[in-house]
Amino acid sequence: MRIWGKVLGAFFGFLLGNIFGALLGLWIGHRFDRGMGLNFRRAPTQQQQVVFFHATFAVMGHIAKASGQVTEQEIRVASNLMDRMRLAGEQRARAQESFRQGKEADFPLRETLAEFRRASQGQRDILRFFLEVQLQAAFADGKVEANERAILHIIADELGFSRIELARILAMAEAQMNFFNRAHGGQYQDGGHGGQQYRQEAPSRDRLKDAYQLLGVSESDSDQEIKRAYRKEMSKHHPDKLAAKGLPPEMMEMAKEKTQEIQQAWEWIREARGIR
C-alpha cells in the first residue's frame, strides 16, 4: 500500500496554515499514489518479455503445423522474423526451440495464450501486436487455410478479441502484405521486409486500395475520419509505447517497420486526396 504521497501532501498542505490546505494536499497525494501504483503494476519486467518471446514463436510453430506439415515457406517466415529481430546464438536457439515446441501435437495453446495475456496485464496494444505477428505466419503461403483460421479464432478468444475484431485485423494484415508486395515486388513472405524504402512514384489504384485497408478505413470515409484512423494506428504501434508495455527489445524493429508502413499508407492517401 502506497501512502507516502498522502502523508507528504497533507503535511505540505497543512503548512499553508489551515485544514483545507491539508485536505487539498491529501487529495493530491492520493492521486500521486494511484498514479505511482499504476506505473509500478504496468512496468514491463524481464519475465514478461520472456513470456512474450516464447509465446510468439511457440504459437507461430503451432500455426505452421496446422495443415499437418510445416512448409519451407512457413519455416522461412519464422527464420526471417528471427533475422528481423537480429537473433543469434543462444537467443536464436531459444526461439527455434519455442517454435519446435509449438509444433508438438500436445502443445498447450490455450494455456500458453492465457499465460501471455496475464503477463501482458491485458494491455490491448500488446495483445494486438502479438496477434498481428501471428497473422504473418498464417499468411506465409499467401492465404489463410481453414485449420489456420480455426487456430486464429482460439488466439482471438483467449486474448479477448471478438470475431468481428479478428476479421477487421485480418483484413488489415492482408492489406499490409499486399501493400508491401506491390511496393517492393512481392518480397513480404520472402523476408525482404526490413529496412526497405518505398518507391516514390504515385501509387496505383490497387496500392491505394491497400493503403485504405491498412489504416482500417474506406475511400468513402471523410478526410477527418481517415486522419483520425491514421493517428490511432500510429499511436497503437508506436515502438516506445509498446516497449513501455512489455514489448521485448528484440521486437522493436518490427514495430518500427509497422509504423513506416502506416506512415507511407497515409502519405499516399493524403497525396491522392489533397489532404493538407
Indicate residue ranges for each PLM-predicted region.
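Catalytic "initiation/cleavage/transfer" segments centered on a nucleophilic residue
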Residues: S67
